[in-house]
C-alpha cells in the first residue's frame, strides 16, 4: 500500500513538471530570464550597420522579419541568443 502511494506521488510530481521552460539571455549574456508560457523562442536584435553589437535580447513567440536597418536572429534552445 505504501509503495502504491509513493508511486502515485512520484508520477504526479513528474507529470506536473513536464512543461519545459526556455531560458533566454538578456542584453548582457551573463544574465538570463525564464520565458513565460507561449514564448518559445529566444531572439537577438541588432542594427545592420553594427552587426556585432546586439541592441536587444529576450523571449518572443514569433520571430519578427528583419528590415533594411534591423536584423533579428531567433533560436529555440536555452541561452542560444
Swiss-Prot record:
Organism encoding this protein: Naja sputatrix
Similarity comment: family membership: Belongs to the three-finger toxin family. Short-chain subfamily. Type IA cytotoxin sub-subfamily.
Cellular localisation: Secreted; Target cell membrane
Signal peptide limits: 1-21
Function: Shows cytolytic activity on many different cells by forming pore in lipid membranes. In vivo, increases heart rate or kills the animal by cardiac arrest. In addition, it binds to heparin with high affinity, interacts with Kv channel-interacting protein 1 (KCNIP1) in a calcium-independent manner, and binds to integrin alpha-V/beta-3 (ITGAV/ITGB3) with moderate affinity.
One CC-aspect GO term: extracellular region
Subunit structure: Monomer in solution; Homodimer and oligomer in the presence of negatively charged lipids forming a pore with a size ranging between 20 and 30 Angstroms.
Protein name: Cytotoxin
Keywords, in A-Z order: Cardiotoxin, Cytolysis, Disulfide bond, Membrane, Secreted, Signal, Target cell membrane, Target membrane, Toxin
GO BP annotations, alphabetical order: killing of cells of another organism
Pfam families: Toxin_cobra-type
Organ and tissue specificity: Expressed by the venom gland.
Disulphides: 24-42, 35-59, 63-74, 75-80
UniProt GO MF annotations: toxin activity
Amino acid at each position: 500500500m505504501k509503495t502504491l502511494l509513493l508511486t502515485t506521488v512520484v508520477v504526479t510530481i513528474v507529470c506536473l513538471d513536464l512543461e519545459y521552460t526556455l531560458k533566454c539571455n538578456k542584453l548582457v549574456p551573463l544574465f538570463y530570464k525564464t520565458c513565460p508560457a507561449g514564448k518559445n523562442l529566444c531572439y537577438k536584435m541588432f542594427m545592420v550597420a553594427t552587426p556585432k553589437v546586439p541592441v536587444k535580447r529576450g523571449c518572443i513567440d514569433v520571430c519578427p522579419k528583419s528590415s533594411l536597418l534591423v536584423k533579428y536572429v531567433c533560436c529555440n534552445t536555452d541561452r542560444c541568443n
